[in-house]
Curated annotation (Swiss-Prot):
Its main location: membrane. Keywords: Cell membrane, Membrane, Plasmid. This is Abortive infection protein. ABI may interact with a target in the cell membrane, which could be the product of the host's cmrA gene, and cause disruption of the cellular membrane such that lysis of the infected cell and death of the infecting phage would result. When phage T5 or its close relative BF23, infects cells harboring a ColIb plasmid, the infection is abortive. The mechanism involves gene products from the phage, the ColIb plasmid, and the host. One of its GO terms (cellular component) is plasma membrane. It comes from Escherichia coli. It is found in: Cell membrane.
Amino acid sequence: MTKIKTVTFVNTYPGGSMKNLLDTEGTVLFPFQTEIHFIWTIFSTVKRLVIGTRDHICQKQYWSACLCILLLMAYVGLCAAVVWFVVPC
């Protein structure tokens, strides 16, 4: 069976309004900005390498692009494994 976690948000703003919520809009992605930049860099590198190969499978750039994708998959898998191990169910 799968447990479903429920999260209850309590309004802690003075006066009971959430008008100051927009002040924290930029900080929502802060813990993930490094990962987003890392993934974006890999995708842009792969795009540049694949465009440079022009459908020639034996070129070094093609295999470099494949290696970048494999490294990205390994990184995402490792992060998922760490989160799965650390976060209790």
